[in-house]
Amino acid sequence: MYYIGIDISKFKHDCVVIDNSGEIITPSCSFTNDSEGFMQLKILLDSLDAETRIGLESTGHYGMNLKLFLESNNFSFMEFNPLLINRFVKSKSLRKTKSDSIDCMMIAHYLMTVEYKPYPALLYHTEKLKSLTRFRDSLIRLRTRQLVELTNILDKVFPEFKSFFGGKFSVTALYILSNYSSPEKISNMNSKSYDALRKVSKGKFSTVNFAKLKQLAKNTVGNTEDYLLQEMQIVLELYSQLDSKVDETEYSIEECISTINPPMLSVPGIGIESAAVILAEFGDFSKFKNASQMLSFAGLEPGYFQSGTSETTGRMVKHGSSYLRYALMNCAQTVVNYEPTFAMFYAKKRSEGKPHRVALSHVVKKLLRVIYTLQTKNLAYDSNFVR
């Protein structure tokens, strides 16, 4: 048996091969993160005359192309949390020496100590979903930032506007700002303008509100200098562009999810976007022995400390993916809203005196057990089997 440790970096990767006894078969060597380097690695792997096990750290997008290359050439591999490798290194030596050659050696040695669980064959879909869901999150953050900028500008141009709409930027509010770009134009809106607003608001924008808004615009204390109006239009255009890109990304996510069709979608309250994040961040559910391991992977388990007679439990450890924790907590809330069994469980925890977020974290634990069962056994959700 040969154990291959690969240390991932941006422009090159380092690799070492050892045998069962830890003896070095191929000393640490580097190969570039391109087709030439990958072929160099393939030649090395093909030359080995026994079964091989490959281990590498989970280091974001730098290793994605290498993983796809290994999968396409029928080489299995196992990914490790960098924190586990770091702790393993510290357990072996007190010296603070670090290099890529040492790292790949430590990965190979750590690979020898654990049960080998190769990365799933659904790598392409998993990586695609992870990239799309994280990109969607980035777009939404950028889009939200434009609304903050818009608020700052409106505080100068038309400070009465946002409070008139309840402090929110509704579809109607954004339509008015995009089509009537100054308080003066808003104050001069006519009956045709109102007809358009009624269509946009689906009949919710009344004539009384229309008259009030025009009056506010007429008497505003805002500063309507050209440069401020120009800034506002640019921000509105950016928001519109980002909004359309979010829609495009969500469509791509839906296409990918429809190909996989995960059983967790049968749980009331779990939508496509949340299911996509959960599936992308967890990857292969079969690599977890139980739902408790999934909870630990997500960083949602409480910290625990015991020494002598002292024993304490603390807050969530919050290791792992913040995207995953956010998605699970959001799912827990919607499942409570749509599924009576989970609603009763949440109410029970609240009746025990637990705060909202703590009670919701208990719902997450219960939900994860359900998701784990559905995904590993390929079952549809049935509330009769949930206790």
Regions found by a protein language model. Name each.
Residues 1-387:
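A detector of single, family-specific signature residues
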